[in-house]
Amino acid sequence: MQHFFADPSCVDGEQIRLAGSDVNHMKNVLRMKPGEEVWISDGEGTDYFCKVEGYEEKEAVLRVVKKEVSQTELASRLILFQGLPKGEKMEWIVQKAVELGAYCIVPFAAKRSVVKLDQKKAGKKRERWQAIAKGAAEQSKRGSVPQVRNVMSFREAMNYAKELDVVLVPYELQEGMKATEAVISKIEPGQSVGIFIGPEGGFDESEIDQAKETGAIPITLGKRILRTETAGLTTLSILMYHLECREQLEDKNIK
């Protein structure tokens, strides 16, 4: 079933008036007709099961059949700090990170980043990445659209991460899977977690030292060297599994 996002202001009791590019997609691409069903999320934790009533000028008019609290968001905020990769890899990373439950994605320029973006190019890239995030959120039935932040320097990204409960830095020279397991096992639902991923070539040693000084925890993801587009998604997958298992266990204990 199709899934779209609407601003809460579009919701008026038992009716939603959807505007913007999604209307053209519904009407002319999907050719949705009156009576067809669709899910609408307001981005603030409420999902609406609706039926299409019709189209008026630049709006799609939907009738709310039922509403419910979104069940697809993690209890924790997982923030992916991604060192700028080459080519179009960032688009793929954004898409998959959203599917895996990332709350926010922060691109940053590391010492070994090959890609250099001026302010104008960075702005255009961010618009593109945000559009991809929205599409991925709709496809994966997310209750909200994760934000892609402006490109930061490594220092700016570290300062941004200071307010988080836990900050993890997968690092190829770090050893000890037991230590990684111990760190992740202590993460509780509701905590905010930052994940720092280096670009191609990894982190410079001085960046790891700086990360440690701010309280970040270097971890290993195993014996193999992962690509920049794989490392973050691997970490998100591990955290998603851990947190959802903890949530289910807590729900079971409450019942």
Task: Give the ranges of each region predicted by the language model.
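N-terminal positively charged helical leader segments and presequences
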Residues: 1-69
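Short, ordered loop/turn segments at secondary-structure junctions
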Residues: 9, 67, 109-112, 223-224
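RNA substrate-binding interface of SAM-dependent RNA methyltransferases
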Residues: 71-168
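Short, hinge-like loop/turn segments at secondary-structure boundaries
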Residues: 122-126, 186, 237-238
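Residue-level signal for inorganic ion chemistry
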Residues: 35, 97, 133, 211, ...
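Structured adenosyl-cofactor binding patch, chiefly the S-adenosyl-L-methionine
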Residues: 204-255
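Active-site/ligand-binding-proximal alpha/beta "capping" segment
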Residues: 165-202, 206-208, 216-219
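Generic structural signal for residues in well-ordered beta-strands
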Residues: 62, 145-149, 218
